[in-house]
Structure formats: structure tokens, C-alpha cells
Amino acid sequence: MTQEPFREELAYDRMPTLERGRQDPASYAPDTKPSDLQLSKRLPPCFSPKTWVFSVLMGSCLLVTSGFSLYLGNVFPAEMDYLRCAAGSCIPSAIVSFTVSRRNANVIPNFQILFVSTFAVTTTCLIWFGCKLILNPSAININFNLILLLLLELLMAATVIMSARSSEEYCKKKKGSMSDGTNILGEVPFPARVLKSYSVVEVIAGISAVLGGIIALNVDDSVSGPHLSVTFFWILVACFPSAIASHVTAECPSKCLVEVLIAISSLTSPLLFTASGYLSFSVMRIVEMFKDYPPAIKPSYDVLLLLLLLVLLLQAGLNTGTAIQCVRFKVSARLQGASWDTQSGPQERLAGEVARSPLKEFDKEKAWRAVVVQMAQ
């Protein structure tokens, strides 16, 4: 009976040596969980089929309707100029819809400014059509053009409503203290080189467009129209602010600058595509000019309009790409588990690292001592 306590002390069914230094063995939990392991999957668990179907459907409908509207507007260039503008303004929304469909999260609310600005342009084109109908009712045939214009308006209205009603659902990793003490700009790489290259090309294209516009205005006073001055105005307004904002954001990325750049690009992209749609009649003029040989006496004006159209398309594409890159960075930051709304500064992050580092060093030292003791035994 007296040997039983000694047998209990010499038994090997007690706590392991590495676990003796811990105060509460029952509360021990591993640092990583099986759900935290990011396995390579083709279809993420947060994928939304409704968002994907809606994005593909809206993008397809907008592309088809814009294509028919551009064709009909170029068949009747003087009577249906409003239809070309409305069709051009809907192109960035269609591009963004296909971009959203490839994402694994609901990013439609991030493009809400672009959808609202496009809806404003289509509404203006509808008012433009009504004013032309009031001023000269006999010159406009209310047929397929009104159907296309109303269809564009309804599609954009549905897109705006869905973007306002949809909620941002993101797959956030459960990383414990990482979401509390880390900065999103330190975790997710910002596309600084891409935005810098975009800004350089935008400045060069804007200066070239201004010079080409001045030359086009001085070619012949009889052929110059008001559409040139309006187009140049939008180039000057839309090009340089977005280029400057892209360069500043690439140099010093932050939440505020990224949001401002998304807003500027979302506003300028539909306007540039609208001007491109208005000048699309120059393509038909160039085609008609090369049908007859020798060409017309005044081909330089139409060629300059075509070059201006290409510059506008380049500017519009770069602005749309800038918006997509910024939204992609924003979504990637949220997918990494970082808090986009409450962002900690460098001092808080440094304090968190200093607070965590002594604990890690203490754990390593204690584990090493336990190993040495076990080897000695």
C-alpha cells in the first residue's frame, strides 16, 4: 500500500515534457485550423451563381444593344447622333459586367459610380431625342431607334438598381490578429507600375488629341462643326485629372486615393466612350472615301476625325482599365482578410509587431529548454 504513490510518480502516463511549461493545457488550441488552409480550387466557396449569371446577362445584352445602336446611328448619322452617344456610353458598363463575372465575390457595388454616370448619359440622350422630336417632328422616324434607346435606358436602370441592392460579400480568411494589426497595402501588392504606364500614355494621348483637334479646326471653316469643340473639352477634362490621380496613387497608395481614382475613372470612362460613339461616323466616311478612286479632294478632315476617334478610344480603354485595376486591388485586399474600412497606421502595425515578437521568442526558448531536459533524461 505504501508503494502505490511512488508507482504513480514513476508512471509514464503523465503530461509530456514539452507541455509541462504551459499553464492551461486544456485551453491549448493549434494556431492553424484546417479551414484556414487555402487550397487551390477552380471555383471558390464564396462564388455567387446569381451574381455571375446577372453579370453575364447584363454584359451580353448591353453589348448586343450597343452594337445595333451604333450600326443604326451610323446608317443615319445626322438624324440619330443621340443613339450613337447612348450606345458608346454603355460599352464600359458591358466590359465591367464581364469583369465582374470572372471574380469570386460580389464586386458590383464597387462600380456603382460608373453605372450611375452611364445611366445619366443615356437619360441625357433620351432627353436629346425628345428635344429633336419637338423641334422637328417630321424629320425623325419613331421606329427601331426609340426601341433601342429605351432598351439601353432600361438595362442601365436595372444595373443601377441591382448594384444598389446588392451587398458586398467577401471571403475573409480567419487569421486572428492579422486583421487587427496589419495594413492592407502591405499584404496585397498594388499595381503601381501598371497605373504609372497608364498615366504616361494618357498624358501623351491627351496632348496629341489636343494638337490634332487644333489642326482639325483650322483645316476648313466650312466643314468644322460643334462636335469637335465638345470632344476636345471632354478630352481636356477627362484625360489629365485621371492621369495625375493615377500617378499620385501609384506613388503613395492609400485607401482615400484608391477610392478617388475609382470615382474619377468611373466618371470619365463613359464620357470618353460617348464622344467616341459620336465620332464613329468618321469610319463610314473613310470607307466611302476609299470606295471611289481617286479619293475625295478633302480627305484630311475625315482622317483627322478618325485619328481623334482612335485617341478617344485609347483614353476610354485606359480609364476603364484603371477602374478595374483599382477595384481588383480593393477586392483582393478584402479577400486577404484585411479590414478596408478600418485601416491601421504604420505606428499601430509596428506596435503590434513589437507586442507579438517577445511572445514568439519566449515560446521558442521554452520549447528548446524542454527538449534539452528531455534529452538529458
Swiss-Prot record:
Cite a single GO BP annotation. Answer: cellular response to cholesterol
The annotated regions of Basic and acidic residues compositional bias extend over 1-23
Q: Which residues carry this modification: Phosphoserine?
A: 177, 179
Keywords, sorted A to Z:
Cell membrane, Cytoplasm, Endoplasmic reticulum, Membrane, Phosphoprotein, Transmembrane, Transmembrane helix
Q: Where is this region: Disordered?
A: 1-37
Q: What's the protein's topology in the membrane? A: Multi-pass membrane protein
In Gene Ontology terms, what is one molecular function of this protein? Answer: protein-containing complex binding
Q: Name one GO cellular component term.
A: lysosome
Compartments where located: Membrane; Cell membrane; Cytoplasm, Perinuclear region; Endoplasmic reticulum
Identify the domain of life.
Answer: Eukaryota
Primary role: Transmembrane protein mainly expressed in brain astrocytes that may play a role in transport across the blood-brain and brain-cerebrospinal fluid barriers. Regulates the response of astrocytes to hypo-osmosis by promoting calcium influx. May function as regulatory protein of membrane protein complexes such as ion channels.
Cite the record's note on assembly. Answer: Interacts with ATP1B1. Part of a complex containing ATP1B1, TRPV4, AQP4 and HEPACAM.
Its protein name is Membrane protein MLC1
Species per Swiss-Prot/TrEMBL record: Macaca fascicularis (Crab-eating macaque)
